From Swiss-Prot:
Expressed at the highest levels in the kidney, at a moderate level in the lung, and at low levels in the spleen and adipose tissue. It comes from the Eukaryota. Residues 1-16 form the signal peptide. The active site is at D91, D278. It comes from Mus musculus (Mouse). Keywords: Aspartyl protease, Disulfide bond, Glycoprotein, Hydrolase, Protease, Secreted, Signal, Zymogen. The gene is Napsa. Residues 391-419 are annotated as: Disordered. It is an enzyme of class 3 (hydrolase). May be involved in processing of pneumocyte surfactant precursors. It is found in: Secreted. Belongs to the peptidase A1 family. Residues 73-394 form the Peptidase A1 domain. This is Napsin-A. Glycans are attached at N85, N128, N149, N331.
């Protein structure tokens, strides 16, 4: 090899970021929910009533799964050998992986409208048989634990424990656009004490670091929902720097929030409060009195179930709503927090702030869902012996300028199931 070629090769290798090669990318699909089919905000009022229990014991805690009817971001995973594909919600507010099973109860309506895992079709399946149950306000989801290989993005054959759902209650699951849920919360949230998928991938050496990040695309064009990145974050997705906020209670991704401000006037959470960053929640929720004051300051008016509406035409003139986290203000414009019911700038729009009183010991809490996360990239870092668990936030790069580049990159990592 000539000295010139050797020099060029060294320069090329020196410019490569070693961490980039280790990132696992999972495309997210954005699904537009039909408001006429099901009110996408249904079930929120049940959040304070929902508790999770396991047949193997453990302390009850709140698991707001009915909120998923309003979630718009989904991805594809595979279970078994060969992989059986499922559309799942990647949820930072829970820690279990579950999908419907071919062994589900005949009267479990949700099973008949979704993809089901068939253990007989997988050569790598291992039975566990331990029963699990998750209690909801509308009934109990129950099933058995099993073990098999998980395929996600560029990761193959991650051996995980997951739930085969045998009974899924109510229309909430039957009408859902997703088959199951992949939890990305901490192990303390896991029903049955099972090892969460993220922990399994790290333990098996498939991920170098227990870190993942979300890049959500709230652009109304197409179904491209952005990207879940496992093992780190992609600097091309955000404008530095990242602001890291320590996790206060490692169960949900819960942090301390210093305050909330509307424009240059109203201040909320004045003495500080707790907030959860939750990818499984679409809106921003908070204590009813504070949300009522916030929406009033914006100019919205109440409707049902803690929802507020506003004239769509007012969106460009609405004040910013700012959240003080880690000593930095994170701002949302009217374009960020106003949700169109119809693809039109006339008529009524939903405001992305909803009243929700979560009782003690879990509450009171603010939940910062996709309305908050949309303009930002969120990095969820479990930490190590030197750094505790934390969440990093940075302003996302413009979606319009990098849409084509991301589509090309996504195609290289994972082929989505049609539909």
């Amino acid at each position: 090899m000539s000295p010139l070629l050797l020099l060029l090769l060294c320069l090329l290798l020196g410019n490569l970021e070693p961490e980039e090669a280790k990132l696992i990318r999972v495309p997210l699909q954005r699904i537009h929910l039909g408001h006429r089919i099901l009110n996408p905000l249904n079930g929120w009022e049940q959040l304070a009533e929902l508790s999770r229990t396991s047949t193997s014991g453990g302390n009850p805690s709140f698991v707001p799964l009915s909120k998923f009817m309003n979630t718009q971001y989904f991805g594809t995973i595979g279970l078994g050998t060969p992989p059986q594909n499922f559309t799942v919600v990647f949820d930072t507010g829970s820690s279990n992986l579950w999908v419907p099973s071919t062994r589900c109860h005949f009267f479990s309506l949700a099973c008949w409208f979704h993809h089901r895992f068939n253990p007989k079709a997988s050569s790598s399946f291992r039975p566990n048989g331990t029963k699990f149950a998750i209690q909801y306000g509308t009934g109990r989801l129950s099933g058995i634990l099993s073990q098999d290989n998980l395929t996600i993005g560029g990761i193959h054959d991650a051996f995980v424990t997951f739930g085969e759902a045998l009974w899924e209650p109510s229309l909430i699951f039957a009408l859902a656009h997703f088959d199951g849920i992949l939890g990305l919360g901490f192990p303390t949230l896991a029903v049955g004490g099972v090892q969460p998928p993220l922990d399994a991938m790290v333990e098996q050496g498939l991920l170098e670091k227990p870190v993942f990040s979300f890049y959500l695309n709230r652009d109304s064009e197409g179904s491209d929902g952005g990207e879940l990145v496992l093992g780190g974050s992609d600097p091309a997705h955000y404008v530095p720097p990242l602001t890291f906020i320590p996790v206060t209670i490692p169960a949900y991704w819960q942090v301390h929030m210093e305050s909330v401000k509307v424009g240059t006037g109203l201040s909320l959470c004045a003495q500080g409060c707790s907030a959860i960053l939750d990818t499984g929640t679409s809106l921003i929720t908070g204590p009813s009195e504070e949300i009522r004051a916030l929406n009033k300051a914006i100019g919205g008016y109440p409707f049902l179930n803690g929802q507020y509406f506003i004239q769509c035409s007012k969106t460009p003139t609405l004040p910013p709503v700012s959240f003080h986290l880690g000593g930095v203000w994170f701002n949302l414009t009217g374009q960020d927090y106003v949700i169109k019911i119809l693809q039109s700038d006339v008529g009524l729009c939903l405001l992305g702030f909803q009243a929700l009183d979560i009782p003690k010991p879990a509450g009171p809490l603010w939940i910062l869902g996709d309305v908050f996360l949309g303009p930002y990239v969120a990095v969820f870092d479990r930490g190590d012996k030197n750094v505790g668990p934390r969440v990093g936030l940075a302003r996302a790069q413009s979606r319009s300028t990098d849409r084509a580049e991301r589509r090309t990159t996504q195609a290289q990592f994972f082929k989505r199931r049609p539909g």
